Every structure is written in structure tokens, then in C-alpha cells.
Amino acid sequence: MGQSVVVLGAQWGDEGKGKIVDLLTEEIGAVVRFQGGHNAGHTLVINGKKTVLHLIPSGILRDDALCLIGNGVVISPAALIKEISELEDAGVEVRSRLKISPAAPLIMPYHIALDQAREKAAGGKAIGTTGRGIGPAYEDKVARRGIRIADLHYPPQLEELLRTALDYHNFVLTKYLGVEAVDFQKTYDEALAFGEYVQPMKSDVAGILHDLRKQGKRVLFEGAQGALLDIDHGTYPYVTSSNTTVGGALAGTGVGADAIDYVLGIAKAYATRVGGGPFPTELDDEVGQGIRDRGAEYGASTGRPRRCGWMDIVALKRAVAINGISGLCITKLDVLDGMEKLKICIAYEYHGKRTEYAPLDAQGWEECTPVYLEFPGWSENTHGITVWDDLPPAARAYLRALEELAGCPISIVSTGPDRDHTMVLQDPFA
């Protein structure tokens, strides 16, 4: 049987998953996206050249890798076409290697209109979505009024589905949110055109994955966002609209639990978060700004500045537990270079008591005060180091502390944005 590895974020997203996925795909049969949409922004830097992917799996830059988009992903036709075009203009062959589940839901124009109008109406209480229609598309999926890739090839059925959806959503848009209605004919024509475009890429993703496993091929499941943004297990309601945890890899592709051999959790050497929601270790001072500047902590999809803070072991241990993480990858270690002191949150003060467990609701998280352990920093440059013993002693001690406190071994350490700026201590596929 082949080996299957799930790569997912162990924090609030933006952990550097794209680079690690690309690193692990040197001898891969397939890379599959299983949740989220084009709100993800996976940045790859190879030989100094930067590529940002939003929908297409990060394995696309490997010539022999098959790239799959599972049923758990919501697809923006415009975003997919744009991304394919940009890659092909750069000389990357995409369409012959990209396979998309016919069960994948579409992000329609009314989803985008709803998302943006709701965020505007919410004002200061906004969740902080990317405004790209992700949440409303998932809502329609659950409400069984979503339009999927498969529906595009049956025009009468598509027309009926679209009229039903627009009757519902245009009422909300015009009567409740006070914005313009979405035009039926324009939306219908665009959907039909996309159906023709995507037809050659439509495939039974679950069937492909089962066949690859029988053939002994390696498969990598590429998560988007992070475990603490999971719709069920995250800081609800400040979460994304899909299951970003390991269960999403199963439901979002059509494989069983026995198909997963290793779960790799990606975490920065510190912590970041975009948008609203609790963040106990946030540094709203010059230290946080320094981390933001050195780490270039601005969203790949939105350009929004990320909130920065110290590593939160309480949150990380929760991610390890709910995902059954086999090993951790710590990224952006080099961002901490030159800092005199470092802190790791090892517990919370919550209602006058110390706890090592995260609350199950956002309000509870907001009421937590971090309890820190302090560690000496290092003045040496770790950028690009690929050998463990070449790291400064203080950096090694910091990583060993993370490993011990999280109760999970560190498999990979990243010391820069390039594919080669990485040390693999334990190969997830070995």
C-alpha cells in the first residue's frame, strides 16, 4: 500500500504549509486539496522565485505530480481560471494534471455579494472574512441548494437550481442587506461557459485516490487555513466555514481513516492570526511589530497585516490532540533571530485558576491570560541553516522545549522561505 500524509496548519493558518507540501512532493503520486477555497494563500519560493497558489494544490510545480481538488473544496470559477492561466503563462502545465471532483460546490456571484454585504453590515462585529463568498457557498452546500461542478453539464437542471437559489438570495440581498440583485442570465451564461472549460478536468477524485493507494503511490493531503479555525473545533464563531482538521481530509476527498498514515502539523516558531477572534498571546507592541516586519506577516491572499504573538502551547496541544498529529514542522525559526528573550505560553489563568486546557468557546478564550516561560534568545543568524547541529544552542533549546511542552516530536524545521531552507529530522513518508 502507498503512504498517505496529511499536512495541516496547527495554529490559526498562515503557518507555511505550501512550502512544506512542495518540499514533500519530490516523489509524489498526487497532492489533493480537501477543504476551503481561494481564501487560502500558499506561498512557494523556489530558487528565489515566488509563486502564490490559492486553489490549485502546491504540488503543481512538480512536473510528475497529479493535482486533485476534492469535494470538500468550494471553487470560484473566475479564481480557478485566473490561477491556471497565470501558471500556464509561466510555463507550468496544469490542465492535463489537474483533476476536480464533480461534487465540488461552486462559489457563485451571489455568494460573493452576500459575503461582502454581511461583513459591511456587521461593522465592528465582523468575523473578518476575505469577502470571497466562501462561507455562503458552504451554507448553500449544507442547505442543499448549492450548485456543483456536476450540475454544469445539465443545462435544464442548472437553470432550475440557479433560479431557485437566486429567488432566495436576491430577496436577502435587496430586502435585508439593501444591495443590488444578482442577474440570472449573466450568471447562467457564465456557469455554462465554465462548465465547458472545466469538463476535461472533471474526475472521480475518490476513485483516483483509492487506485493510487493500491498502486503503492505516495499521496499528500494539503490542508488550508489552520486547526484552530475549524468550524467545529476552532474559536467559534471566529472560524472558517470548513473542517480544517484531519477529519476534513477524509470527508473532503472520499477516503477512509485507514488511508491516512501520518499527520504533519505545521506551526510557526511564534503565533499569528488574521481577522477577529481571541488570541491570548498577542503582542500589541513594538515586539509584535518587529516580528511582523521580520516575518513579512501580511496575508498572501488579502495583504492584511497579521496579528503576531508568542508561541501558545495550550493552543498547539489542542491542535495536536484533535488531529492526532504524528509530528510537527516548525517554520520561520529565523524570524526570531536577534531577539534577546523569547516567551512560550504554557498555561492560561482563567477565572482565577490556572489551566492547561483551552476553553471551547471564543468568549472563554478572550477571558484567558497567558502564563509564560521565558527563554534566552540568540544573536546568531539561523537563516538557511539545514543541519541541526549548526543551529545556535539557544535555538536548539527553544525547539526542544516546544517539542517537550507540546508532547509531539518535531519532524521538520524551516529556516527561510525557500524550499532548500529546511531541515528534515524525520521524513513523514519514511
Curated annotation (Swiss-Prot):
Keyword field: Cytoplasm, GTP-binding, Ligase, Magnesium, Metal-binding, Nucleotide-binding, Purine biosynthesis
Residues at which IMP binds: 14-17, 39-42, 130, 144, 225, 240, 304
Molecular-function annotations in GO: adenylosuccinate synthase activity; GTP binding; magnesium ion binding
Catalytic activity: IMP + L-aspartate + GTP = N(6)-(1,2-dicarboxyethyl)-AMP + GDP + phosphate + 2 H(+)
Pfam short name (any one): Adenylsucc_synt
Cofactor dependency: Mg(2+)
GO cellular component assignments: cytoplasm
Main location as per UniProt: cytoplasm
Protein name in the entry: Adenylosuccinate synthetase
Family: Belongs to the adenylosuccinate synthetase family.
Description of how the protein assembles with itself and partners: Homodimer.
Binding site for substrate: 300-306
Subcellular location: Cytoplasm
CDD domains, sorted: AdSS (cd03108)
Enzyme class: ligase
Top-level taxon of the source organism: Bacteria
Active site feature: 14 (proton acceptor), 42 (proton donor)
SMART domains documented for this protein: Adenylsucc_synt (SM00788)
Pathway this chain belongs to: Purine metabolism; AMP biosynthesis via de novo pathway; AMP from IMP: step 1/2
EC number in record: 6.3.4.4
Biological-process GO terms, alphabetical: 'de novo' AMP biosynthetic process; IMP metabolic process
